[in-house]
Amino acid sequence: AMNLNLPDKDKEIYSLLGSGSVGNSIRLLKYDGATIYRSILSFLNQLPNLNGFELEKFVSTFVGSKNREQLELLIELLNIAIARISKSGVLEENFLDQALNEENDIFQKLCPNPNIAKRWAELAQVQAKNLSHGLAVNLDPGSLILDTFFRIEDCAKTIR
């Protein structure tokens, strides 16, 4: 049996992102999903103005055939993050019970109400489709992910 001495804040993030699936949680652990998700959150925290240089540096670490698993995890976590932004606007106060501390302030700023949640929900749907299609037809994964972040940035700029 694996004995995992995870800090409590990581236990929370793994159970949340793993959606209760043991297999998913193990994959998240193996590829350090908590760190990847926290990085995504730190970029979301920069909105509406992303630091393009920092973002490119981050994304470049996922590109290359030996990083395929990490890349797929990054895409999955990015899709989860966008969907959770939308969910936070719909559920408002009730979202706090199921949110990570790091998410609360960021998501409240990005999605203050159910009206804006619709925009994020549409973006989540479109981007999930674009990413999976782009990978299927072998578009450059780095460009796909950067494009997704820039579309997130565009959406954030409409909220003021």
Predicted regions and their residues:
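Charged, glycine-rich active-site and insertion segments that engage polyanionic ligands
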Residues: 1-77, 82-84, 88-160
